[in-house]
Design a protein with these regions (language model features):
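Non-catalytic cap/lid and distal C-terminal segments of serine-dependent acyl enzymes
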Residues: 1-237
């Protein structure tokens, strides 16, 4: 039951097979985390990586969607977007839900450490970017995949430099990825986000950019996450 969102939300939670209450675990938060969305795929990837590479055991929290167009977009005055997305513009509430309700709930009920990942694609990538620019301390690791930065005439990209310059230089990992076969605007905007982050002068910001050569918007997520983990945990040697 979320007081901020004023509705019940379903969480899908995966605990590692070796879950031990005397240890603490990093947490991955998945924005499109319904059973029929990305949750099972990403749990499977994590189990595969556990067998093949030196990757930590993660707790994985899939946030099942109710209305992603409402939750993952900020307000826009553009009439055509308001028409196509009638419930739009409540990402501020959803971000408050993440920081004030969801994370404290997970930290209270499970053995978590300070490492928190967020994985978002498309509108979820837009939301992850908004969190990175406005509430960066909510997560330590950002997987921003094919973000819908075209939203509101790219207004978030246009504000990014100013928002970044107001931030402290904290340890953070940001992975931006997009499929080469996606719409040209998606590719251009993802590249722009990476360039803005790269030129932000943040010494402790670890950045990776991946233009997925063979992927489109429908196929990009799984391979992107796989490659992102490879960049973080290269080999079991």
């Amino acid at each position: 039951d979320s007081k901020i969102l004023n509705e019940k939300r379903t969480l899908n939670i995966y605990l590692p097979q070796t879950y031990d209450k005397t240890k603490s675990y990093p947490v991955i938060y998945i924005l499109d985390g319904s059973m029929n969305e990305d949750f099972l795929h990403l749990v499977g990837l994590q189990q595969f990586f556990n067998m093949q590479f030196k990757i930590p055991d993660f707790i994985i929290v899939g946030i099942a969607n109710v209305d992603r167009k409402r939750d993952f977009t900020f307000h826009t005055d553009l009439k055509d977007l308001q028409k196509d997305y009638p419930t739009t513009g409540h990402s501020d509430k959803f971000i408050r839900f993440l920081g004030e309700e969801l994370q404290p709930f997970i930290d209270k009920n499970y053995k978590t450490d300070k490492t928190k990942y967020i994985i978002g694609q498309s509108l979820g990538g837009l939301l992850a970017t908004e969190v990175l620019l406005n509430k960066p301390n909510l997560f330590t690791h950002y997987f921003i995949i094919s973000p819908s930065l075209w939203w509101d005439d790219e207004s978030l990209l246009n504000k990014a430099n100013a928002l970044l310059s107001a931030q402290k230089d904290d340890e953070r990992f940001v992975y931006v990825s997009v499929g080469k076969n996606e719409h040209k605007t998606m590719v251009k905007d993802a590249d722009s986000l990476f360039q803005i982050l790269k030129n932000s002068g943040k010494k402790k910001l670890k950045l990776e950019y991946n233009l997925m050569q063979d992927d489109n918007h429908a196929t990009v997520l799984h391979r992107s996450v796989y490659e992102g983990f490879l960049k973080l945990y290269p080999s079991s040697d």
